[in-house]
Amino acid sequence: MMRRLVQIALGFAVAMAAYAHTPLQTSVPAADASVSAPKAVELTFGGEVRLTSVTLTDSTGAAKHLDSVPTTIARTFSLAVHDPLSPGAYKVVWRAVGGDTHIITGEFGFTVASSEAH
């Protein structure tokens, strides 16, 4: 009986850990990619999250205008980029709240290639 209770508890703990961790699975542009200037930044997570902030900055740290962060809970978010992006390095920093109310943060960079490179 005790062994069965331990198995159930372990199963529950593993399930909760899986639910608790909703990492960023993919992004568009992809991390470290060299791309044409994107029209949007798309983030897809391993589970549903509430996205609380996303910033896009250039190599000087200047913020670029994105859509407002939606208030919905979802796996995928797409935020339009409203400023033209010149060739150079960019960084996306995001923050979300997972289903277990833990805060998840991350960042990735990408490069906008010059039009001659494409």
Feature-to-residue mapping (PLM):
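Extracytoplasmic/periplasmic copper-protein system
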Residues: 22-25, 103-118
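Short, surface-exposed alpha-helix to beta-strand junction/turn motifs within ectodomains of secreted
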Residues: 41-65
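N-terminal signal peptide c-region/cleavage motif recognized by signal peptidases
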Residues: 15-17
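Sec-dependent signal peptide recognition
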Residues: 3-11
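Surface-exposed, short loops/turns at beta-strand junctions within beta-sandwich domains
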Residues: 83-88
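A short tyrosine-centered beta-strand micro-motif
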Residues: 90-92
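Short coil/turn motif common to extracellular beta-sandwich-like domains
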Residues: 34-42
